Amino acid sequence: MSVQADDPLEPFYFEHEEQEICGKLVAPITDSFQEDYPSVVDRFFTRYYYFKGDVPYQVLYHSNRICLICLAPEHPALAQGISSVNFDIGNVDRSQNVVKGKGKKGGMILQAESTLALLTTANGGTYKVPSCIRGKLVEVNTAIVEEPKLLEQLPEGAGYFAILLPKIENCDAIKASLLTQEQYEERLKSKNEGLPQIESTGDHAQNKNKEIQA
């Protein structure tokens, strides 16, 4: 690695020193770098999708039940440019949500169709971001209020709106109400080809989630 002469970090840059073990040279640690190493999302989350009308949202479902609510990569706001995010939706401010202890007591209970945040775009458009699943609101990502462009810039999963925690007994029903990655891609393909689309969770799942008991 080339560095400037006055670089204060120069003493800390990695420099390989040849090492021999059992008559064989040990390869430098940089040789073990995998450019295609699975991302955090690929390793620990399952991707699901929720449609509000024709607008897609992503639910990243962790093995411990924690769910990250995000914009799907094809959400139109990402192409339009995001100008603001607000968790004060009028009758309640989601950012004032407070949970306590390991049991996350006190958090707001949200329905799939509950408005989680308001998003405005550079062209003046407004989107009511849905909660996508029924669950307890654990926290909201206030960083995207201060820097809305993070939703466009951060890698998958990092630019989330909120963390929700569904009840264990509701997990199977919630997963069934969402689209899998394969179903999502099939829906997008059908839309592009003008074919009948897989029922969106904005219609199908909202009714199904209402049947799930709190």
Curated annotation (Swiss-Prot):
Please give the InterPro entries that the UniProt record associates with this protein: Abitram, GCV_H/Fam206, Single_hybrid_motif
Gene3D superfamilies in the cross-refs: 2.40.50.100
Q: Which residues lie in Basic and acidic residues bias regions? A: 201-214
Q: Which residue ranges are recorded for the region named Disordered?
A: 189-214
Pfam family membership, one: GCV_H
One Gene Ontology molecular-function label: actin filament binding
Functionally, this protein is described as follows:
May regulate actin polymerization.
Q: What is this protein called?
A: Protein Abitram
